[in-house]
Amino acid sequence: MYDGFGVDHIGIGVDNMERMKTFYQEVLGFGQLIASMPRKDHTVIHELQRTAPTIHDHIHFNQEVGGISIALFRSYEPVPRPIREDFRYGDIGLSKATIAVNDVERFYTEMKGGINFCSQPKHTTISEWGDYHFVYCRDPENNLVEFVSDANIKGKSKFGGMRSVGMSVTDLPRSISFYQKYLGFDKVVVKTHEKFSGLVDEISGGTNTQVRSCVLVNSKGGGMIELFEVMNPRGRSIPFSAIWGDFGYLQTCLYGYDIKYTEEYFKEKNLEFLLTPKVIDDPVYGGMSFLYVRDPDGAPIEFMTIPKP
């Protein structure tokens, strides 16, 4: 069985590193530096990008309160380009980051001068969760970010951490089965519902948007994952030409302790590998290792090891 945890971080390919760093660090409070890597040829991902050299730099940070963290990657070789010219809610793969705030309506009022909100604040009620208030913005490179508040979010700080990542899928039951069976998301936090239908037209590119969604978590720890299927208009598949390092949401990263066991487990279950296990070639990460597989829709999933406590 899968021997790991839930979501550790997400990766975003960026065009303008300084502009994106400023937005996430200074505007959204991701001021806790985890690590950074200089611009160089990272030989361990030649296999992932199927070329050489693979030159990029990156920075990895989080909000002070914790939660899912963010890694920004700026690729130089191979030359990157936007995954899409227009990112929409429902595009297949990693589609959004969901960040908790104390009060969505107040946050919207206070921050609309400095954040590019692309929806009005909305509200619905979800049976397992209760009142759910949300609003969407686009970061400086057009990626969707959701801000949420509800009775489960408490605290005095403006931000409550990135609570979940949103994966848009083509077949929700199939994806639920995959993430539960193979990736350890064994606990259902929110059962499948359609409460967001009709509330996300501003970001879906359509009208009367129909969507069904659920939230899963690994009971051993790590961040949550929202799986959602946009049934009308249908989500657009991952472009065939997209490569790792292109601009946009790149990957969801899970974590655990034993890379060899995980590799053998994924092989036994016939998961498709994008990258076989590699050791990170940077002393900052202390020899941690990682691999990549695909989910049923082709979205990249990274699994990386962390030191045992």
Go through each PLM region and give its residues:
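Internal, hydrophobic cores of structured domains that mediate oligomerization or house catalytic pockets
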Residues: 136-148
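Loop-centered beta-sheet repeat module
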Residues: 145-173
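Short hydrophobic beta-strand motif reused across regulatory alpha/beta modules
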Residues: 145-148, 225, 301-304
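Core segments of cupin and vicinal oxygen chelate
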Residues: 13-67, 128, 168-222, 261, ...
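Vicinal oxygen chelate
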Residues: 5-15, 55-76, 81-110, 132-138, ...
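Basic/polar N-terminal segments that are highly enriched at the extreme N-terminus
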Residues: 1-3, 309
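A cross-kingdom feature marking solvent-exposed beta-strand/loop segments within repeated
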Residues: 36-55, 77-95, 102, 113-114, ...
